[in-house]
Amino acid sequence: MPAFDIVSEVDNVELKNAVDNATRELATRFDFRGVDASFELKGENIKIKAEDDFQLSQLVDILRGNLAKRGVDARAMDIKDAVHSGKNFYQDIDFKQGVDTLIAKKLVKEIKASKIKVQAAIQGEQLRITGKKRDDLQAVMALVREGDFGQPFQFTNFRD
């Protein structure tokens, strides 16, 4: 029986490249000359630092642009609130890895409501979709792409 998995993961190499490119762009920007601003990548967490709240939003925009250039979906970003400490503002950005249980349940509910003849099973941080016809599986892929679940999804392990 044909099957595939729905996963949500961020490529760490592309994430590192995007942060490096954003740091390079930050060094060449005229409005950040003489300003203490930086990006710091630790695992799947990026810590940004700037002297002003407005500059933090500019840094997030720079990062979003570089993520888009590298093919990383910006919907995977989980932006925390800005923290003011001393003369600097700090902000943490986490990246969502894996399909959260609540989102997985919402996906299963949406797939069942569409009346497509497939079975959806939650397996840890991924969803396994199984059906008799490849066309049904492709219809589920289109349904997931169209839906707004607040998280990007990838389709892996397609079996015939």
Swiss-Prot record:
One CC-aspect GO term: cytosol
Gene3D superfamilies the record matches: 3.30.70.860, YajQ-like, domain 2
Alphabetical UniProt keywords: Nucleotide-binding
Top-rank lineage group of the source organism: Bacteria
GO molecular function, one term: nucleotide binding
Disulfide bonds: none
Presence of the UniProt keyword Cell division in the record: no
Pfam families per UniProt: DUF520
Task of the protein: Nucleotide-binding protein.
Family, as annotated: Belongs to the YajQ family.
Record-linked HAMAP family: YajQ (MF_00632)
Name of the protein in its database record: Nucleotide-binding protein VF_1240
Organism: Aliivibrio fischeri (strain ATCC 700601 / ES114)
